[in-house]
Amino acid sequence: MALLKLDIADVRNIESASLSPGEGLNLLFGANGSGKTSLLEAIYLLSRGKSFRSPQSGRIIRFDRPCLTVSGSIGRPGAGIAVGVRLGRSEKEVRVGGRSCDSSAQLIRLFPAVLIHPASVALLEGPPRWRRQMLDWGVFHVEQGYLDLLRRFSRTLEQRNAVLRGDAPGSSLAAWSGELARWGTMIAELRSSYLDRIRMHFGEMVSALLGRTDVELVVRPGWRAGWSYADALAASQPTDRRLGYTEPGPQKGDFAVLVGGRPARDYLSRGQLKLLTYALLLAQAGLLEADQPGRVCLLVDDIASELDSRNQERLLSLVKSTGLQSFVTFSGATQGVAAVVGRTARVFHVEQGRIRTGS
């Protein structure tokens, strides 16, 4: 069980709401603009300390209020941990177990939530940094010291770039290059290992959603394939000096999704690409659940967006089969929902920011 109780205050059009979700499927019904997505946004805030819809807190806080508050209990019945996020227009407070935290890292580790929504397709269509963020979030949950490793690499990269620009007289480019190669190689190896572990789950999800077996994940470390990072830095040194910054490295890392050996985004329809993205995110959730049973939460917004009824039912059936605590929003026609979920789901109705338990 991940989320035992949720209390929301002043998140967009939700003035005040409380709910006790079920441990499996939680279905949220309501018209467009009713507050369904805002409810998912509140859960995401409780998991990551930030919104997935806007980086500007003023757009998330109810228009006439100074701040928003989302709090809840995470864990198992009788042993829940109190967590909370208070977000003002220029400040944020995160609390875990009644104590303030310096960052959201403890919250993220305690309550991992995976989000699937219509814009998730940008994960495959968008820039590499979004795919790096997905990888790094996943590695963070399986490697205890990964966040510190990323910070070490970032600091060392800044130092090497300063030498390249001539802003650090007396510093040795060779020394910083050696340090950078050490941290960068470790990051690339951890990302590659993580992607290897996702592949099995991903293949199962792709088969269930698209019926394909010719989809593969290919890692790109951020430098020439087959080279060590140290060799790539040495070869790139003249270019780096001219540019004033370090060109190769995990800061340029990426991964590709190929279908029949071709980039998925150049081969599949938008609906198929969306299903492929959902398969990737479900695979990430499945891997994390295998490592940390009972702690993962799945958020699925607007399941009907750009999917026909058959694919909606496939996706909902797959979400149900994961056994994860899941929150799924619906608007409009929902004829196939009952046939897929039976009587196992907990149902909520959202109307103008108010939430009530239904059937």
Swiss-Prot record:
Its main location: cytoplasm. InterPro entries: AAA+_ATPase, DNA-binding_RecF, P-loop_NTPase, RecF/RecN/SMC_N, RecF_2. Keywords: ATP-binding, Cytoplasm, DNA damage, DNA repair, DNA replication, DNA-binding, Nucleotide-binding, SOS response. Pfam families: SMC_N (PF02463). It comes from the Bacteria. The keyword DNA repair applies. Gene3D superfamilies: P-loop containing nucleotide triphosphate hydrolases, RecF/RecN/SMC, N-terminal domain. One of its GO terms (biological process) is DNA synthesis involved in DNA repair. ATP binds at residues 30-37. It is found in: Cytoplasm. GO terms for molecular function: ATP binding; ATP hydrolysis activity; single-stranded DNA binding. One of its GO terms (cellular component) is cytoplasm. The keyword Mitochondrion does not apply. HAMAP family: RecF. Belongs to the RecF family. The RecF protein is involved in DNA metabolism; it is required for DNA replication and normal SOS inducibility. RecF binds preferentially to single-stranded, linear DNA. It also seems to bind ATP. This is DNA replication and repair protein RecF. It comes from Methylococcus capsulatus (strain ATCC 33009 / NCIMB 11132 / Bath). The gene is recF.
